[in-house]
């Protein structure tokens, strides 16, 4: 991993860490010498469901009774997110993809909300902003609560001169203004981990991903936008739109530098980050530093996974994979159990119950108005 380690003075947090719930006391009593994995135990499931968990970063494109039953059993609520990806045949057609997502939302018995998007590949078309806003507003009328800006802006799409189009391109500004005017949230996945711009490193958490998805591996490409350029463009969106709620997906793509995340959260009150698919980066930091960081920014960290499921796949296998991911994250955040990551053992953070409730539930409700059905 590259970047700096985030360090805090810990004196102010020890009292809060000492306030353990039953799931933490159980783990402390049992000890944590052996790494734990797999799906939830009955005790773990009881503790997990009690926080009313919300996964604010999921991609669901099936309407399967067994899958829906699993979501209910885990007492989960989801934000179902669409993107336009010209590299994936399943994600090229925004209208068709959205229909599949809405079908799941409508069948979820109020357990899913919808995050729409727009087609950035049309950015050079005449009337791009107006047609995108028209689509987005139609989705708002259907009940969408957020809009996704994806990493192909900054890492793939180019202008007529062959330059990478960045997130603060003027063509997008009317869209951001419209989202803010409707009191919706922008989910911004811009840039990727540092390893996308670095020489191959098998020790990186993302090594396998870039081997399988070379289109996003910027190292060695001619004249790519740097990660810093892309994130600075994101920051200009925050500055130009102070009333726009922005959730930076994947720790805001600042996963290697928790000091930088902290600076952004201090500087931009309209900015929060989700934890989706970046839990390994938390595990790689010193435990005490992560506890201090999370306690300080407990109102700005939102739980998400980036779990996905598509039609035509093995639903049962995916269900097991989903539950194992929720169980692994819960053990790391909520208990002092020992987990194994890349051949080494990692101790859970055993966060206080009130902090877990914020990360898993309260922050999602505040940063994504409408994520829960009005009847709750």
Residue ranges with predicted function:
Residues 1-7:
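Bacterial N-terminal signal peptides that target proteins for export
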Residues 15-18:
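C-terminal motif of bacterial Sec signal peptides marking the signal peptidase cleavage site
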Residues 22-111, 131:
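An N-terminally biased module of ancient metal coordination in phosphate/nucleic-acid-related enzymes
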Residues 36-37, 222, 227-236, 241-376:
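H/E-rich (His + Asp/Glu) clusters that bind or coordinate divalent metals
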Residues 44-46, 95-218, 269-272, 279, ...:
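Active-site gating/metal-coordination segments in enzymes
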Residues 54-58, 78-81, 112-116, 147-149, ...:
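Hydrophobic faces of well-ordered beta-strands that scaffold small-molecule active sites
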Residues 57-65, 85-97, 121-130, 157, ...:
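Acidic-and-aromatic substrate-binding clefts and catalytic sites of carbohydrate-active enzymes
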Residues 58-60, 144-149, 169-190, 239-240, ...:
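Conserved beta-strand->loop/alpha-helix structural units within folded catalytic cores of enzymes
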């Amino acid at each position: 991993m590259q970047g700096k380690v985030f360090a805090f003075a810990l004196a102010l947090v020890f009292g809060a860490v000492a306030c353990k719930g039953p799931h933490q006391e159980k783990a402390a009593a049992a000890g944590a010498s052996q790494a734990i994995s797999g799906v939830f135990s009955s005790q773990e499931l009881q503790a997990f469901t009690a926080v009313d968990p919300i996964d604010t970063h999921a991609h669901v494109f099936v309407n399967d009774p067994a899958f829906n039953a699993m979501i209910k059993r885990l007492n989960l609520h989801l934000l179902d997110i669409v993107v336009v990806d010209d590299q994936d045949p399943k994600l090229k057609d925004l209208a068709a993809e959205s229909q599949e997502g809405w079908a799941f939302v409508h069948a979820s018995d109020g357990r899913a909300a919808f995050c729409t998007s727009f087609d950035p590949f049309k950015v050079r078309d005449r009337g791009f902003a107006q047609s995108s806003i028209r689509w987005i507003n139609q989705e708002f009328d259907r009940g969408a609560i957020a809009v996704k800006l994806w990493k192909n802006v900054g890492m793939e799409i180019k202008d007529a001169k062959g330059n990478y189009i960045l997130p603060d391109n003027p063509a997008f500004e009317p869209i951001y203004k419209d989202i803010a005017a409707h009191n919706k949230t922008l989910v911004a996945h811009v840039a990727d981990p540092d390893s996308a711009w670095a020489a191959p490193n098998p020790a990186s958490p993302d090594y396998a991903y870039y081997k399988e998805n070379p289109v996003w591996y910027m190292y060695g490409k001619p004249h790519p936008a740097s990660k810093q350029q892309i994130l600075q463009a994101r920051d200009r969106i925050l500055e130009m739109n102070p009333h726009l709620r922005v959730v930076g997906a994947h720790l805001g793509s600042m996963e290697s530098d928790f000091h930088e995340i902290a600076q952004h959260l201090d500087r931009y009150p309209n900015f929060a980050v989700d934890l989706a698919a970046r839990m390994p980066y938390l595990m790689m930091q010193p435990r005490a530093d992560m506890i201090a960081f999370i306690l300080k920014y407990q109102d700005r960290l939102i739980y998400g996974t980036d779990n996905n499921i598509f039609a035509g796949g093995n639903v049962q296998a995916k269900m097991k994979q989903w539950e194992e991911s929720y169980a692994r994250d819960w053990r790391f955040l909520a208990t002092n159990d020992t987990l194994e990551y890349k051949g080494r053992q990692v101790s859970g953070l055993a966060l206080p119950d009130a902090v877990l409730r914020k990360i898993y539930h309260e922050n999602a409700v505040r940063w994504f108005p409408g994520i829960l059905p009005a009847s709750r």
